[in-house]
Amino acid sequence: MSKKSNKNLAFSLLGLIISMVLLSFASVPIYNLFCKVTGYGGTTAKETVSVYSKVKGTKPIIIEFDANVDKDLPWRFIPRQQRVQIVPGQNTLVFYETENLSNNDIIGTSVYNVTPNKAGKYFVKIHCFCFEEQLLKADEKVLMPVTFYIDKDFELDPEMQDIKVLTLSYSFFKVREIASLRGNTKY
């Protein structure tokens, strides 16, 4: 191979590596945008301002809560309530308990999903901890609030008539660990 073809190959490989790194950082925002636009994957609606509904529905719905932690994240993460029964339009506050089981400060982030997927568009989050980095110090335990309601139009949608239970599921993933010695950070 000539020096010119070696240079071309090196630049091509470098470009490929840079593209892969950039794509990996952009994948979560791109996925979030895709889910928000298409409603795919049980993505919920999100209120930008806390709107407290004055009119409530009549059909009770059970909301179950699920919590998962990636194997690389030494946290305990559980819902404080296993389930609640609400009616559409009823604002609801629940908590998830999170505990860092390690000797190091760790930053994690969570993603969520609502099942059945077709009902996700009616699940409106007013406040939650998802998609935001959460720092838990070594051995720290915190309560993380989620405020939500089911849109009143849920009752009017014929496709929702058979749904009596929704599940809100969160999964936490490790972003990075901060070593116990100051100034030393693991990435």
UniProtKB/Swiss-Prot annotation:
It is found in: Cell inner membrane. It comes from the Bacteria. Residues 31-187 are periplasmic. It holds the Pfam family CtaG_Cox11. The keyword Transmembrane applies. GO terms for cellular component: plasma membrane. Residues 1-9 are cytoplasmic. GO terms for molecular function: copper ion binding. Exerts its effect at some terminal stage of cytochrome c oxidase synthesis, probably by being involved in the insertion of the copper B into subunit I. Belongs to the COX11/CtaG family. This is Cytochrome c oxidase assembly protein CtaG. It comes from Rickettsia felis (strain ATCC VR-1525 / URRWXCal2).
